[in-house]
Amino acid sequence: MKRLYLIIIVVSLMISCTNKKSNNDEIIPQYIDSLNYYREIKDNKKMFYYIDTLKALRVKMPDIAMEYAVAYAHLKQYDKAIQILKDNISSSSKPQLLYNEMGNIYLIKGDTANAILSYKQAINCNPNYARPYIYLANIYKENNEKELAINNYLAAIRLFAENEYYEEMGNFAIEILEIDSTNLDAIKFLQYYCYNEKDYKTALAIGFEIDEICVKQNKLDEGYVNMYFMGMILYDMGEYEKSISLMHQASENDITAKEYGYSICCYTSASYRKLRDNEKADYFLSLAKEVDKDDAEKYINDLLNRNNGNK
């Protein structure tokens, strides 16, 4: 009987602990959301309340160290904020975030050298984290170190493009063009932004500008790639004959044909289908199938069924 009583007590404790863990699992994300909200509006009192509450729930300090540091930074206790970050970086699962925040706090202090070092450490931890590139670029731009500024903006923009953050991609392309109005990479990213916004007329106008720059800078291969992209834009504008013409010109370049030949055939087939020239549509479909027999028809049907902005 005594043994049964002990078993009941143990089971009750286990259930209690399980329920407590379950409740914590539900409430902790809510507290973190509240903490992030009060961080945004810079309500330090509420921030410290939620930080202390999370600590009491045994949330590991490295997971809330950044919020703790930001709260102290809002109070202008910068050294204490930086020390909190330093103490927790080695045990954090995302040290790049802490290094990045450290850079921000150093920058507020006016310690540009350590800010740069912190942002670079953030990049070393995770080269695919875009924000520190932006902060570095801003510093270099302010110091008139144009090449470094452009290179860091471009590093961030490429990451934004890969992750489909098109608005950021467009905004920081404009930042580069304020430094160098003929930077071809930035112009192409701006064009890509306009294309994704379905602002086809602007994207096409930028395409003509790219064409002129490619000629002036003797970047002929890039000029042919631009023809291909302009062909895509013209297709989405419903200008099928013009699209076919540019796709044909683009395919005359070996590099473009090798890289984009399959897509060129698909767009050309779809354009001819739109023009009701089924013989030529079938011909380019057959060429596309030589590259990917399983995907070609689906690719072309997707093009045919796509809702175009026609802006």
What does each model-found stretch correspond to?
Residues 40, 74, 108, 142-143, ...:
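Register position in tetratricopeptide repeats
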Residues 61, 95, 129, 163, ...:
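Residue-level recognition of tetratricopeptide repeat
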Residues 64, 98, 132, 165-166, ...:
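TPR alpha-solenoid repeat register
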